[in-house]
Amino acid sequence: MELWPGAGTLLLLLFLLLLLLLPTLWFCSPSAKYFFKMAFYNGWILFLAVLAIPVCAVRGRNVENMKILRLMLLHIKYLYGIRVEVRGAHHFPPSQPYVVVSNHQSSLDLLGMMEVLPGRCVPIAKRELLWAGSAGLACWLAGVIFIDRKRTGDAISVMSEVAQTLLTQDVRVWVFPEGTRNHNGSMLPFKRGAFHLAVQAQVPIVPIVMSSYQDFYCKKERRFTSGRCQVRVLPPVPTEGLKPDDVPALADRVRHSMLTVFREISTDGRGGGDYLKKPGGVGEAGL
């Protein structure tokens, strides 16, 4: 007579215990709910990328494949109860290349980006994303431009090539000039690569501001609920006649206008507002 259950029975009991535990954690632990939601968010994107790859592969690496990725990702906001409001979309130049610069708060920026992404527009992303499984391959097929931020020389070379691509292939690029995600509810100093790119190509800069997520999402507090995000497209900033020496002032001017709008459209649903008052400025030259 066996005193202990077999391995199969033990695994079944553990599985049943997990099924009972998950709903308890979901309703009783905001932190657990946060991790579940983020795990599903990332996992769902990887799954959608698997579905997109065969469709995108028909064209090969092509900026038009970004339309396929956008179509497949637009529904995610509904799964999380996030309402995305777009204002100022008429500011996009109708028939010329340009550089989009946007603030960068978290991976949820993808929702706002897909909502407002103009035609023939691709992001510039860090090279590490290229190795992110199915998502990396789907991004490559969609024409996403990858740069190695640790190798400044290579990044500058890529930017020079991008400037030529903008003009010869009628492409727009989307850049996060903060260079990394910013969770403090303000804006980090801007790196100047996007502005050098726009000046080199003599194309306009289109600033896009996404309101703070603090009322429904906070990584530090492990909080992720439903909420509203406003995406504001600002009037294009011309660069005709500007030279490399004008880049610092240009970056400072664009950041100031974006920060002003960010403070205007952002609200703290829990009654605070101090997170919008943190100082910052334009960073040293770099990418």
Curated annotation (Swiss-Prot):
Placement of sequence motif HXXXXD motif: 104-109
Disulfide bridge map: none
EC number per UniProt: 2.3.1.51
Cellular component, GO, one term: endoplasmic reticulum membrane
Record SUPFAM superfamilies: Glycerol-3-phosphate (1)-acyltransferase (SSF69593)
Catalytic function, reaction form: a 1-acyl-sn-glycero-3-phosphate + an acyl-CoA = a 1,2-diacyl-sn-glycero-3-phosphate + CoA; 1-(9Z-octadecenoyl)-sn-glycero-3-phosphate + (9Z)-octadecenoyl-CoA = 1,2-di-(9Z-octadecenoyl)-sn-glycero-3-phosphate + CoA; 1-(9Z-octadecenoyl)-sn-glycero-3-phosphate + hexadecanoyl-CoA = 1-(9Z)-octadecenoyl-2-hexadecanoyl-sn-glycero-3-phosphate + CoA; heptadecanoyl-CoA + 1-(9Z-octadecenoyl)-sn-glycero-3-phosphate = 1-(9Z)-octadecenoyl-2-heptadecanoyl-sn-glycero-3-phosphate + CoA
One Gene Ontology molecular-function label: 1-acylglycerol-3-phosphate O-acyltransferase activity
Biological or metabolic pathway of the protein: Phospholipid metabolism; CDP-diacylglycerol biosynthesis; CDP-diacylglycerol from sn-glycerol 3-phosphate: step 2/3
Lumenal compartment spans: 27-37, 149-287
GO biological process: CDP-diacylglycerol biosynthetic process; phosphatidic acid biosynthetic process
InterPro entries documented for this protein: AGP_acyltrans, Plipid/glycerol_acylTrfase
Top-level taxon of the source organism: Eukaryota
Chief place of localization: endoplasmic reticulum
Function comment: Converts 1-acyl-sn-glycerol-3-phosphate (lysophosphatidic acid or LPA) into 1,2-diacyl-sn-glycerol-3-phosphate (phosphatidic acid or PA) by incorporating an acyl moiety at the sn-2 position of the glycerol backbone.
PANTHER family per UniProt: 1-ACYL-SN-GLYCEROL-3-PHOSPHATE ACYLTRANSFERASE (PTHR10434), 1-ACYL-SN-GLYCEROL-3-PHOSPHATE ACYLTRANSFERASE ALPHA (PTHR10434:SF65)
Name assigned to this protein: 1-acyl-sn-glycerol-3-phosphate acyltransferase alpha
Organism whose genome encodes this protein: Bos taurus
Gene field: AGPAT1
